Each structure stands twice: as structure tokens, then as C-alpha cells.
């Protein structure tokens, strides 16, 4: 298992980037906010790393549950909130390259990334400004898995902000 860090910032805007660091604190990638036609404004991020460009964002037109558009070097894949579990915790699933992907919050509020039932990565959000990523050594060499894992941290942040807002609104009415 290899360890990486996402060094987040308070407010990420189009001109500012977040770095992804390896165990020796070397920059292995950068993440920026971006816009992609067909995605909700403010919900799309791009990961760049030596010849790899991946974007992940929330598709326009959702009511309650999100559909995620993941693009990597010209290919596009769709992931969706798991309608049963997403009401209770962050849970995204989909099929990429004929493999079933599950990205799911565990009891420790960490995100487990599984491919065909095998856990390949763990996102450990810190309370503030970043996350630690633990990724299977072999899996870390696959641009699709590595970039999607890094970008999913930002979808988790959006999910948490939105659920906090919904909880606040519900408290007003109860």
C-alpha cells in the first residue's frame, strides 16, 4: 500500500491548484476547479499528472441524487449515487471498463474504493484542508484508478456541504 496526500486549500478557484504528494512530499499531480459543458457549475475538477488529464463533475439536472461524469484522456464514464445508501452516507457506484466500482463511506467517515469487490484505495479526509490516500501499490500505477480516487475527495466535500445544508433546513422545520 502506498500513501499519498491531497493538500487542500480553503477556497479553490480556477486559478488555484491543489497538489497531490507522494510519501516523500514530491508533487505527483495537481487538481484545479474547471468547467465542463453539461456539468453543474462549481462541481467539476481536473486532475493533471504527466500526460494524464482527468475530470470529474456532477452532471446537470439532478434533483436529489447525483450522476457523475468522469473523463480520462477523451473517454467518458458515468457513476451515480446509490439511491438506497446515499440518503444515509456517501455512496457512489458504476461500471467502468466492465468492472463494478463502489466508492463508499465507511463507519470511520473514510471512503473505500472497491473494484469488482476488491478494496483498492482508502480516502481518509482530514478534518481540515486535505486528505490522506492509501492506494494498493499496483493500483496506484493505473491512471484511471489513481485520478478517480484523487478527484472523488472533492465529490465527498460537495456531498458533505449539501447534506449539512439539508440538515440545517430540516432543523428549521422540525
Predicted regions mapped to residue ranges:
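Short, well-structured hydrophobic secondary-structure segments
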Residues: 38-72
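Helix-adjacent hinge/juxtasegments
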Residues: 62-92
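Low-complexity or membrane-interfacial segments used for flexible interactions
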Residues: 1-42, 51, 76, 88-174
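Periodic aromatic/glycine/histidine/acidic cluster detector
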Residues: 29-32, 55-58, 79-81
Amino acid at each position: 500500500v502506498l500513501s499519498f496526500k491531497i493538500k487542500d486549500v480553503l477556497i479553490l478557484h480556477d486559478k488555484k491548484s491543489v497538489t497531490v504528494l507522494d510519501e516523500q512530499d514530491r508533487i505527483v499531480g495537481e487538481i484545479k476547479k474547471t468547467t465542463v459543458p453539461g456539468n453543474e457549475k462549481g462541481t467539476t475538477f481536473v486532475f493533471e499528472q504527466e500526460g494524464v488529464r482527468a475530470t470529474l463533475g456532477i452532471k446537470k439536472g439532478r434533483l436529489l441524487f447525483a450522476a457523475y461524469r468522469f473523463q480520462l484522456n477523451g473517454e467518458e464514464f458515468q457513476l451515480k449515487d446509490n439511491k438506497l445508501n446515499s440518503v444515509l452516507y456517501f455512496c457512489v457506484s458504476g461500471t467502468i471498463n466492465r468492472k463494478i466500482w463502489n466508492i463508499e463511506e465507511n463507519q470511520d467517515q473514510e471512503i473505500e474504493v472497491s473494484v469488482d469487490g476488491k478494496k483498492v484505495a482508502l480516502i481518509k479526509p482530514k478534518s481540515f484542508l486535505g486528505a490522506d490516500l492509501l492506494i494498493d501499490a499496483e493500483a496506484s500505477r493505473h491512471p484511471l484508478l489513481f485520478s478517480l480516487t484523487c478527484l472523488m475527495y472533492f465529490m465527498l466535500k460537495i456531498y458533505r456541504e449539501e447534506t449539512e445544508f439539508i440538515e440545517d433546513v430540516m432543523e428549521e422545520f422540525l
